Amino acid sequence: MSENLEKTYNPKAIEAKLYEKWCDNKYFHAEVDRSKKPFTTVMPPPNITGKLHMGHALDNTLQDILIRYKRMQGYNALWQPGTDHASIATEVKIIETLKKQGIDKHDLGREGFLEKAWEWKKEYGGRIIEQLKKLGSSCDWDRERFTMDEGCNKAVTEVFCKMHEKGWIYKGSRIVNWCPVCNTSISDAEVEYEEQAGHFWHIKYPLIEDDGSVSTTKFIEFATTRPETMLGDTAVAVNPDDDRYKDLIGKKLLLPIVNRELPVIADSYVDMEFGTGVVKITPAHDPNDFEVGKRHNLPEINILNDDATINKNGGKFEGMDRYAARDAIVKELDEMGLLVRIEDYSHNVGTHDRCKTTIEPMIKQQWFVKMDELIKPAVEAVKNGEIELIPKRMEKTYFNWTDNIRDWCISRQLWWGHRIPAYYCDECGEIVVAREMPKVCPKCGCTHFTQDPDTLDTWFSSALWPFSTLGWPEQTEDLKYFYPTDVLVTGYDIIFFWVIRMIFSGYEQMGERPFKTVLFHGLVRDSQGRKMSKSLGNGIDPLEIIDKYGADALRLTLITGNAPGNDMRFYYERVESSRNFANKIWNASRFIMMNMTEDFDIPSTGINPQELQLAIADKWILSKFNRLVKEVTDNMDSFELGIAVQKVYDFIWDEFCDWYIEMVKPRLYNSDDRENKTAALWTLKSVLINALKLLHPYMPFITEEIFCTLQSEEESIMISKWPEYQTAWNFEREEKGIELIKEAVRGIRNVRTKMNVAPGKKASVYVVTDNQELKQALEDGRLVFASLACASEVILQQDKTGITDDMVSVVILNATIYMPFAELVDIRQEIERLEKEEKRLSGELARVNGMLNNERFMSKAPEAKVAEEREKLVKYSQMMEQVKERLAQLRK
């Protein structure tokens, strides 16, 4: 072979050029081809604000593994890429950029701001795509989409209008999660709950007597974590079955400070066992109170402005921040004698996942999706197995959300995003939902309209991603061929945001499931198990890892040991281990190529392996590999990607490199038998090429470079055929025989290590056994056994003829192996060495015992130091025992 690999593996030298080659040759591209079976997956579109992080790296590596695997299996594999406009995240980022330039969003106006936003998107929006390419992602970049491109915009408008026509979308006043910093509503899924130390304020409201006077002795007591919301109270509720309060139902209380009369109502929502069994009802600021208020026709009094200051309904507290108002109200209640006590209390507080501001439940006019009917097909699909969630335990999380679903608030008070296609008649206020600006008001005939200023929740457009990217609402050939998709790979943290919404959108718009399987992965945490975050400063930049170790090392690290749905810890040591594995493959490949001289340049095709003189070692490795192909393929088909690559890793490192290559070296170096050498080289090359194919989805760059250097028949490993299991390549007898030989070799190596035998020092090996299977294996593999065991000769016998007392022995399986002691070591030199070691250990033991028996040391030294010295005592004692035992043997 005239061409060989560079002496050392350098990822920087190969990765960029190989990726360019793949793109130039359109290996990632998929077109409709009815002669092939399609396999489709859509990329969870990363935000255009995004920079590649470890979560992206894991998510896209998993997808790339699946798409490369299916491509090699002959599927017409499409991985649909794209980016998300990320409404609120992008708007916040652009506002920050403008602030640095001294520009205020509102000074620009909506159109001016959107111009800046598109400029920003053009400059920075594609950054993460270039970073994904560095990872090796084999997406069809010719099909790259954006959630606000023309096609997606059309799909969003069509869905909104269709759902409004069906009554699924409506505008109404309901409780929403309001972010007072971002000044927008957010969905339940965008609220993060974190435990915070707070208080329960125990307050009492006085009873209004039948004559209208306010009682000074009769009160109803309750507790609240948000005393400022009392300004919006419109009732106090008790459970209808609570005997303590039955006489008070229908009575009136006086709301202190505000001096508003509140009815005492009965509602089963109230838990009699919690606190005093009394709940104040604030319909405009609590979702549960809102529902109670609807049942009892209570007024809804909003006390907050959009920035969470008190509005005019708060009377004298108007203009105060919510927390300042809280303090002032509590102070006044205390002065009035109506504050019973303050109790420390830890509770979950909802915060906006973007800006971490405490959200305010607030009644607002918003657009909603009615979920009660829409969600039913999504529930049934998972229940009946039409859509499979992996791991299965994710079903519990899925159903927990669907069982407690609320109507989805889809309007956002933002400018960047899909503007809601609703138009208000300037004359009569009639709302017209339409695919384009209406010409005439159907109610009054006016021709002037103003479009709703709000935009849609980012996840509204993302929910359409599996079919909008294929051309819907047009019935394109792509849509007919590639939809429904096969698998969705995503993090478990967006099951609510995205997965469920895609499922019900798929059934509602397409009448079928959007995908067959959802493969969930966990989070990538730091080595201590902590979530990576800016505040902790523990984030790890995958691009830095790629720059230092190569993309393949990062990919292998992220997948090895990874199980669906489980979080993983990231260790730099594991990346180094992955890099070492790459070096191992590289060096093994170079070794094989160096032995393929012009006389022995083995072609990849044109040789009938059945005609080769395969030795026992050849048949063993071929049989082991054949079994590996079946197991790995089964694992891949079951989405056990971490298990699959661990098996490939173990096979290449252990069976192929550490054992088989060592087994065939005598045949390569010393054999004059051309046919024997040809069989060895063919086996080496064949197994390596096919092992590279199994590894390719995980480590695409190094496998491509070696594959294309090792053979010339195929232009790229990524479009080569995935190996298939063949029963003809099962060699059970030879496989078992080599395993017996390996066990015997391990025993011999252990003895040599204990005796400190110099590497390469040869000695006679006597194997005493009456086990015919072992004898046959050693006969068939005598050359292999002798080489691996450093045996000058191998003597097989059934009895102890010729065995002397000065031989060392080891019992392995059904055999005893003997080696002449004098052939292994120079006894005098070994005794001298061990006597020196005995003296050194004696000194160490004296020192450690002295410290541990020293009262001052034991009382003042840190616990860790004392523990360290105790560990040394155990270690040195064990070493001394071994040295003494060895000396006793030698002196005999």
Can you say where each PLM-predicted feature lies in the sequence?
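Alpha-helical support elements that line or immediately flank enzyme active sites
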Residues: 56-58, 287-292, 501-509, 648
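Short conserved beta-strand and strand-loop elements enriched in small hydrophobics
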Residues: 203-205, 250-257
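Secondary-structure transition/capping motifs at alpha-helix termini
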Residues: 68-76, 97-110, 130, 134-139, ...
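Feature 926 captures the class I aminoacyl-tRNA synthetase adenylation module centered on the KMSKS loop
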Residues: 202, 400-460, 464, 508-551, ...
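Residue patterns forming the tRNA-binding/recognition surfaces of aminoacyl-tRNA synthetases
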Residues: 3, 17, 21-25, 95-215, ...
